[in-house]
Amino acid sequence: HDSVTGEISPAYLFVGVLSCSSFVYAELCRDMKSENFILCHVHAYEYFGGVTRLLVPDNLKAGVTKNTRYETSIPRAYQEMADYYDTAIVPARPKAPDDKPNAEASVKFATTWILAAVRNRRFFSFEEARDTVAEKLELLNDRPFKARKGCRRSAYEEEEREFMHPLPPAPYEPAIWRSAKVQNDYTIPDGLNRYSVPCDLIGECVDIRLTRDTVEIYFHGGRVASQVRLKKAQRDAVMEPGHMPE
């Protein structure tokens, strides 16, 4: 809730569960667009202290663009993240919860348990709500099982952790991919500013890889330019002298 206007802003809960131990990672996000969706995976791997051999996502747009009996299509940014962590994406079939029955039940339980724990609270900042979800996550993972000894955290440490792949030296930095036609002034936009590319690409369609700090331009699969991404809008394009006509 906005403390001044009373306006309610939505938030989205990301939940990832390890199928053997039911160890949970949950994170509150402002949206579930590609960048946040991928960043939640990065945070989950850091939380688990390792990488799963398989990823079985639900069929939301940020994770699967097409999933039919004959064809599966994964968004480029999501596949790039999976390649970085050396894991395979195997989307669950639409309306087929039996593809991951243990995880499906655990996700539903974790979601219900966390949301039930905060449903009667009114939050006046996203950060407050996010931190509360993080606190409830720890309580959930330390909550004793009813049917057996231990809890989710102890089950993970004893039964599943040794089978996780090791983390890479540095966390993956999420990237957004776009396509654009190079303008007559041999620039492309990133949504905030314009950046130059080699002038001989005028009129060509290029792929743009955007991270928080860099703008990379690819043509026919090869990188042709890379520039530091500006955080603030500026009037003039960012021009690289080597891109200019002779």
Residue ranges and their predicted role:
Residues P57, T68-R69, I89-T112, F126-A129:
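RNase H-like two-metal-ion nuclease catalytic core shared by retroviral integrases
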Residues R212-E246:
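Protein C-terminal end segments and domain termini
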Residues I8-S22, V56, M81, A110, ...:
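Short conserved beta-strand segments at catalytic cores or DNA/RNA-binding microdomains
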Residues V107-R209:
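Active-site-proximal acidic segments at structured loop/helix or strand boundaries
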Residues V51-Y70:
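Acidic/histidine-rich, metal-coordinating catalytic segments
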Residues H1-V24, M32-N36, E173-P189:
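Mobile-element integrase/transposase regions
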Residues E71-I89:
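Two-metal-ion acidic nuclease core segments, chiefly of the RNase H-like superfamily
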Residues S9, A26-G50, K231-A237:
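Active-site beta-loop-alpha junctions of metal-dependent nucleic acid enzymes
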